[in-house]
């Protein structure tokens, strides 16, 4: 049974979910100060024992009254983030960590994913939860909507709560991430964490990932083996998966001695995803006379291509062959039998949770890198071009 406490919080036995997808209402000024100072402490901008600015400086910085500043300091002191010394000033305290440790005495693992209810994420979370339940761990779950500000809030929540370990799916993993300092704070506090689906290349962190290069390589090679030589790619470029899937596509073309054609690439990111339908329509219209096949970033994109082709009157696979990636439930339940490749999903979640538990148990020699190999799932969206295949041979 799920109990709804308020709009941004869902509580379930052994599962707490925080969702930051809604914009926050206007906050009282003292609350703004509290959140800013907490953020500086949790990210390491203010170190333990460091004196924070004086009340008068804070008045000027935040444009508030002395009363508002004192109210914020009192609240932060009560929560264990600050301590005041008469005649000396106010300093960063570590009492919040001991309070948090008490709060998480029931053994809690934090999980941060980009999304919760979409695509392959329910399966991944199910795998995590099933493994944690075996050792009586609770799960504290947050989503970022692939937005770094929401990731920041999720990390602050995990640090404040004092989770015993953390499993993270990175946000916009192919771009610079401004929240690296929070991950370093977890390291400094000896809180084990691992990443799934991708990782931040700036950090040395254990991870569990599909071999995305191989996935896209196999997808492209499957089309080549069916005689296709004019093959396009739909790529998402703000996530590391997109970078490596493009790499696999380029490698497969090179191995087959086929020319890479930039005009056959359509890229998008989180912000432009809403425009993908319109952009696909233009892209397919411009290339339909030459391009015979498409490697899609994932199944979701593949099915969007199907929708656009229906509107444009492009028959799949007679006029255009397509292949997805991830073997998601939406592909399995689609009206068209999409050719795709596997993703570990639930197994990945289980293995990441198992790694965290073993780390907390003091186990040594745990893997730093785990790659899962994709397998082709044959569908009905690829046409064999026999004559062209013979020409390639």
Residue locations for each model-derived region?
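Short beta-strand elements in bilobed, periplasmic/extracellular small-molecule ligand-binding domains
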Residues: 133-143, 233, 252-274
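An alpha-beta-alpha
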Residues: 217-258, 263, 368-382
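Hydrophobic alpha-helical segments within soluble ligand-binding/sensing domains
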Residues: 204-233, 243, 251, 273-282, ...
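Periplasmic-binding protein-like
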Residues: 111, 163-172, 194, 232-234, ...
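Flexible loop/turn connectors
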Residues: 36, 281-393
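Alpha-helical recognition/docking segments in bacterial nutrient-uptake
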Residues: 2-25, 35-39, 93-218, 285
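Short, solvent-exposed amphipathic alpha-helices that sit
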Residues: 120-134, 215-218, 240-259, 304, ...
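N-terminal helix-turn-helix DNA-binding module of bacterial transcription factors
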Residues: 2-103
């Amino acid at each position: 049974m799920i109990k709804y406490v308020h709009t941004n919080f869902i509580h379930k036995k052994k599962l707490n979910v925080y969702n930051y997808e809604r914009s926050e209402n206007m906050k009282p000024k003292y609350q703004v100060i509290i959140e800013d100072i907490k953020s500086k402490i949790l990210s390491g901008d203010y170190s333990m024992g460091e004196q924070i600015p004086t009340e008068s400086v804070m008045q000027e910085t935040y444009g508030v009254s002395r009363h508002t500043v004192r109210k914020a300091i009192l609240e932060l002191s009560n929560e264990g983030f600050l301590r005041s010394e008469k005649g000396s000033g106010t300093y960063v305290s570590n009492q919040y960590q001991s309070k948090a440790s008490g709060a998480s005495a029931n053994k809690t693992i934090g999980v941060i994913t980009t999304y919760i209810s979409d695509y392959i994420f329910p399966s991944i979370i199910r795998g995590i939860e099933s493994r944690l339940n075996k050792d009586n761990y609770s799960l504290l779950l947050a989503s970022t909507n692939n937005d770094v500000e929401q990731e920041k809030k999720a990390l602050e929540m995990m640090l404040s709560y004092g989770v015993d370990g953390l499993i993270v799916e990175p946000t916009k993993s192919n771009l610079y991430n401004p929240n690296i300092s929070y991950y370093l704070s977890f390291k400094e506090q000896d809180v084990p964490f691992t990443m799934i689906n991708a990782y931040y290349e700036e950090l040395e962190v254990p991870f569990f990932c599909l071999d995305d290069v191989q996935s896209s390589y196999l997808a492209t090679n499957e089309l080549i083996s069916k005689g296709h030589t004019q093959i396009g790619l739909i790529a998402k470029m703000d996530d590391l998966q997109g970078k490596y899937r493009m790499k696999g596509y380029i490698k497969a073309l090179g191995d087959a001695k086929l020319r890479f054609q930039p005009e056959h690439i359509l890229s998008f990111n989180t912000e432009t995803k809403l425009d993908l339908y319109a952009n696909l329509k233009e892209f397919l219209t411009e290339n339909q006379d030459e391009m015979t096949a498409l490697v899609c970033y994932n199944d979701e994109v593949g099915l969007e291509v199907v929708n656009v082709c229906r509107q444009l009157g492009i028959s799949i696979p007679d006029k255009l062959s397509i292949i997805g990636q991830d073997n998601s439930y939406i592909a399995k339940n689609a009206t068209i039998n999409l050719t795709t490749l596997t993703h570990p999903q639930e197994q990945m979640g289980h293995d990441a949770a198992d790694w965290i538990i073993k780390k907390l148990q003091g186990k040594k020699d745990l893997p730093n890198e785990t790659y899962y190999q994709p397998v082709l799932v044959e569908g009905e969206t690829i046409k064999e071009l026999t004559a062209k295949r013979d020409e390639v041979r």
